[in-house]
Each structure stands twice: as structure tokens, then as C-alpha cells.
């Protein structure tokens, strides 16, 4: 009986690993495709069905603004020690750079103690390869570096700036856009108009840099860049983010802010749950 029970347990573990690897990892954080918290489909949420049935309309948009502001206020209320300045050659920058990937790492139960996100075992390496290829369209070193460069130099900082400066959503549209694209653009434009007087484009730094840091660690784990290169990239990302943001709380709030703009662009009405998962991860880290 004990042997049979153990076999049943082992079979269930193997079945779960095989059936969820691509489904779960293929829905993780990607540019305009995959900023979905890890393994949401494995979590039981009482309101999931109701939320996905909601029609994406102006009322839902306004409700999401309220949810965003309430969630950001929740993070603002958390205690955090005063930031300590580091010298340029301080070894603490290496740890700081790794922690920039903290929110995504927390959602995926990745290791934050060093550069490697997981143990180097075939099943985990295949999961990370699948994630990066399917969600980000990255298939090697060149693609990886191009995406990191894009996030660090343009990303949602530039996108939010363009949407904020446009006098109408039509300025951001062209003849190739279908109706869904136009609705997506209009939602993101309304978001930018709602918050442009409160948050500058630089406030998107946490959203852009956090994802770039995670890609850096994934790329290093897969051997697409060396650990020395990864440390250098994370140092550069660290210098950029501290120019724009002044605390880990603000970093987490930036992640929420950028994440909601992405959800609005995608027309994903699960945004409220998404904000909650991001806030929970940030709370754990803080």
C-alpha cells in the first residue's frame, strides 16, 4: 500500500510538471504579451469567472483606476528603511541589481540569493527557454540584448510619454490598425491623460528596468550572456533606476502603474487580480 501510494504521488508530480510547464511558463512576463503573474491558472480565485466575463468599458476603466490608486496607497503605507547611498564601486550594487528582478522572481519562486534563478537541471532550463521564446520572442543572445536595450532606453517610459503628449488618441493611430487596435490605443491614451499631471514618464522606470533585470538573469541562466556581462548590465540598469525612483516602494508602485497600462493596451479585464498579485509580491519583498 505504501509503495502504491508513493507511486501515485510520483505520477501526479510528473503529470503536473508535464502538463503545466508550457502553459504556465508561456504566460509570464513579456513585452505586450506576457506580463501575467506566474501560474495564475493554478490559483483558485473565487471571482475569476466573473472577472473574465466583464465587458471592457469606460466604467471598468474607472474602476481599475480606483483599484490602482488603492493598491499603490497600500504599498505606500508599508514601512521601509531610509535609503543608503552606495559608492560607485560598492559590492552592494550586485545584490541591488539582482533585487531589481524581485517582483517577477517572487511570483515565479525564483532564487534571489545569486545570479542563477534556478538550479541547472534540464526541466528548469527547458521551462526558462520556453518562457523567453514564447512570451518575449527571444531566441538567443542577439535578441536578448536587443530587448534589454529597448527596455532600458525606450520601453514604456517612451510609450507613456508619447501617449501623454498626444492631444487625441487618433494622433497615435494609423491606417493599418483594426478596431481592436484603435480601442486599445484609446484606452492607453485615456490612462496617460488621467495620470500625466501626477506621474512623469520616468515613473515607468521600475516597470521597464524590473523586466530588463529579469531578462538579464534569465539570459545568464541560459548561457546566452556570461555572468560578468550580466553583472555589468545589472549595474547599468541600477544606475538608471536610481535616477528616476527613490525607494523600493516607489519601484513597486511603478510596476503596478506600468502593468495596468499594459493591461489596458491588451484589453485584459483580469487587471484587478493582476494588480493584487503584484502588490502581494512587492509586500513580501518589502
What spans do the regions from the language model cover?
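Polar/charged low-complexity regulatory segments
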Residues: 2-227, 231, 235-286
